[in-house]
Amino acid sequence: AAVDVYPKEPSKNGEEFVTPLREFDNVILTPHIGAGTEEAQRNIGTEVAEKLALYSDNGSTLTAVNFPEVSLPAIRENVSRLLHIHKNVPGVMRQINEIFAKLDINVAAQYLQTTADIGYVVMDIHSNEPEKVVPLLKQIEGTLKCRILY
């Protein structure tokens, strides 16, 4: 599900947004986007839908406002793409790569960007069983979310 308008919204920037919907992995919450004209509303709706589809389909977060921006190439054959969101602290990338090394998994590509607080790394790996890697990545201290994109 995706939600853009909420019964009780923050009244100003920086105010914490609290809703029980934040607990669910299958819910996407976007900021309420106002528009002055029907055309602007349509265009904003189209742009938001395109950005969500791009994130959903390939992991790109280009033009994200409060999240690290990562622009990704098209899907490559014979790789699995993993998404890892973590606290931006020293040592996370080392631990991620140590897991791949211990499992003898070749990393085809890694794309990392950070903000002051959050790190977002997208990894294309050569593995027939990427589902075995995710539980290990989730155990890394500071991991906020990790999943297989494809």
Predicted regions and their residues:
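Rossmann-like dinucleotide-binding domain for NAD(H)/NADP(H)
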Residues: 1-74, 120, 150
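A conserved regulatory-domain signal marking ACT and ACT-like small-molecule sensing domains
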Residues: 62-150
